[in-house]
Amino acid sequence: MASSRAAKSLPLQVAAICYRRRGSAIEFLLVNTNGGNKWTFPKGSTDPRLSHSQAAEREAAEEAGAIGTIEPRQFHLYLHAKGVFWQPGGVQEFVVKAFLMEIHQMRRPDESNRKPTWVTPDEAKRRLSKGREVKYLRELEAVIDRALERIQFHNELWGSYPTTRTSRSSASV
């Protein structure tokens, strides 16, 4: 997890860790990066007019067409890097606040090049690992593990995710 010192000195992004239930199985929603050669969670910049969870929810809708219930508080903080590692100065690090979001509906994403794809937790880890340095890969694996723990917690406590706020759309998951 990102240290508090790093969190204070790096730019901030927000991510929606989108999931759905398929019977007793959990699937995560990944999108292609802008370059198209890596997979990631829907994420992006904060907006002073929105809470961080609302900004993450916006990213899920724009990049993946995902509509659902997002937790108002982050469940994890992780480091992410953009750029190319083999060029000096080619990488920008970010601290990312991760928000868990259960998806109820899908629509056409605003960013059509993102190719939203549902995958198992193991497949998510495999896809997230491609083309990444080990330290960032471990950060993303930890996001999946923490998300699964949180989902299990919700299942044990409430029997499912507590529905508090759901956006609207025309297509179901």
Enumerate the predicted regions with their spans.
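Charged phosphate-binding loop/patch that engages nucleotide di/tri-phosphates or the phosphate backbone
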Residues: 129-173
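Short aromatic/basic micro-patch
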Residues: 40, 93, 118
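Short connector loops at helix/strand junctions that flank enzyme active sites
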Residues: 9-14, 34, 91-96
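Conserved N-terminal beta-strand and adjoining loop/helix that marks the start
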Residues: 2-28
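Short, charged/polar surface micro-motifs in flexible loops or helix N-caps
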Residues: 22-24, 35-38, 47-48, 79-82, ...
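Active-site segment of metal-dependent pyrophosphate-handling enzymes
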Residues: 61, 65-107
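NUDIX/MutT-family hydrolases
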Residues: 98-141
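Conserved Nudix-box catalytic region and its N-terminal flanking loop in Nudix hydrolases
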Residues: 25-69
